[in-house]
Amino acid sequence: MNTSHHHGLHHSFRNHSQGALPVGKPSHGDRGSASGCYEQLLISTEIFLTLGLVSLLENILVIAAIVKNKNLHSPMYFFICSLAVADLLVSVSNASETVVMALITGGNLTNRESIIKNMDNVFDSMICSSLLASIWSLLAIAVDRYITIFYALRYHNIMTQRRAGTIITCIWTFCTVSGVLFIVYSESTTVLICLISMFFTMLALMASLYVHMFLLARLHMKRIAALPGNGPIWQAANMKGAITITILLGVFVVCWAPFFLHLILMISCPRNPYCVCFMSHFNMYLILIMCNSVIDPLIYAFRSQEMRKTFKEICCCWYGLASLCV
């Protein structure tokens, strides 16, 4: 986001933090232990590249598994696929922007202001759009799990595959437009406040859904258990799905919260020494964001036997080990 005369998500926040050094405090050029807190934490390009590549492969595997396995052709997994696409774009965009900046710094790429600005705007728009898509996809999954538990007998009439596809299309259309607008007007404090407000509003909404879900789930499961057939088994599977999504939400909050705290401090106390010290670790917060994209596919694999089975089949086919796929 372009919050200073330097462009790009990485450089704008780094330079904003450095430019906000309190008067009388040592800058990055001064010696002494105190100055270390105000220097931007440097992380090698190789780490960004590695995380980006791992996330790319993992999330492609998730998307391929959902497309390949017809048992995974359900609204919840379609929303998970949307989340995987968002995770993939976040990591790839972060890694790509880091590589471009490294090439420019090393003199291996044309250092023209207009070209750099346009490239950074594209990368930043992708990152911002993907962030919004992640939040909305998580909310869609939460609503889907809520319906399966509290409206179990009407679920297939309420949440059809066609309706899920329409929801995903609306999510990505809205998030793409919003992401571009956020970057175009990112120099405005109002835009940052809107982004922060959206993040916490969506988290509060999802938290309220899950609290209500788990508080009343046991009572509802007892009612379903009284019905003939596979009601109890199906309900238990739905609860397992709800727990999986709760884990995803928890990981999302842990990985993204430092970034949004950085934004809050950047707006509220840009010259406070403690705030500046926190903001100096911006690169670490980018790493946490990319780690979220790496962790999510592992959660899918750990929590879903069907996903693990499909992952194994795809990996075996990739390596030509067809006999092991049986």
UniProtKB/Swiss-Prot annotation:
It is found in: Cell membrane. The keyword Membrane applies. The chain crosses the membrane at residues 47-67, 72-92, 122-142, 164-184, 191-211, 247-267, 282-302. GO terms for biological process: adenylate cyclase-activating G protein-coupled receptor signaling pathway; energy homeostasis; energy reserve metabolic process; negative regulation of feeding behavior; regulation of growth; regulation of metabolic process. A lipid is attached at residue 316 (S-palmitoyl cysteine). Keywords: Cell membrane, Disulfide bond, G-protein coupled receptor, Glycoprotein, Lipoprotein, Membrane, Palmitate, Receptor, Transducer, Transmembrane, Transmembrane helix. Residues 68-71, 143-163, 212-246, 303-326 are cytoplasmic. GO terms for molecular function: melanocortin receptor activity; melanocyte-stimulating hormone receptor activity. Glycans are attached at residues 2, 15, 94, 108. Residues 1-46, 93-121, 185-190, 268-281 are extracellular. InterPro entries: GPCR_Rhodpsn, GPCR_Rhodpsn_7TM, MC3-5R, Mcort_rcpt_4, Melcrt_ACTH_rcpt. Residues 1-31 are annotated as: Disordered. GO terms for cellular component: cytoplasm; plasma membrane. It is a multi-pass membrane protein. The keyword Lipoprotein applies. Residues 1-14 have a biased composition (Basic residues). Belongs to the G-protein coupled receptor 1 family. This is Melanocortin receptor 4. It comes from Danio rerio (Zebrafish). The lineage of its organism: Eukaryota, Metazoa, Chordata, Craniata, Vertebrata. The gene is mc4r.
